[in-house]
Amino acid sequence: MIELRDLSKQYGARAPAVDSMNLRIEGGEFLVLAGPSGCGKTTTLSMINRLIEPSRGNVFIDGVDTHQTDPVALRRRIGFVFQDVGLFPHMSVAENAGIALKLAGKRPQEIGARVDELLALVRLPAEHFHDVLPGALSGGQRQRVGVARALAASPRLMLMDEPFGALDPLTRDELAFDYRRIHERLRLTTILVTHDMTEAMLLGDRIAMMREGRLVQVGTPHELCSAPANDFVRAMMESPRRRARALAEVQADEK
């Protein structure tokens, strides 16, 4: 269970990037942090594993204040997937996926077995991808390696910052639903950042909607659609429908 209590981040005299955020994420939940660009989603995510230190407030993981945990040890227990996956170009798929295990001092045989397991999990079978360099991979395949790398140390918590945003629509959908399958199979707790409301509604058990550093509303996709807290939430939740209507009009005009 993850709990954010009065979590805030301020840079100088500017308005807070995150302002007094209170949120509880249950174990095994898939929570989406959603909202427009610049609303504080990534800052919030980065305070959970202390890549960014809060100006005020606390993060509790399974009842333990993260301020009481060494930040390096904390990050080793949490999987993190970025939009820019950042694979080492001179290292093979297997070496990239197993880098955290190597740094942790695991034996080569143990690393090899775990990497093969992870590559199968993310649908990159080792017999085809083990020795391939990142430059020979598609964007979706590189992101799959990033997911495998994040899962290598068997974290219970996964933080994902716009992980599918740079991919083409077909690859994005395929990888997103594959990750949801992994989330359920491994019984992970996942916090995903996105501004794509279609993605948020399809993947999230709940959506935490943010605006200008503040948490506006939290609920299931159905709850936010049927009872939005204000016009902003209503507009955000209706954006997939507006796009669908616009597309239908374009298709109708072409007939």
Regions found by a protein language model. Give the residues of each.
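Conserved ABC ATPase "signature" region
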Residues: 109-128
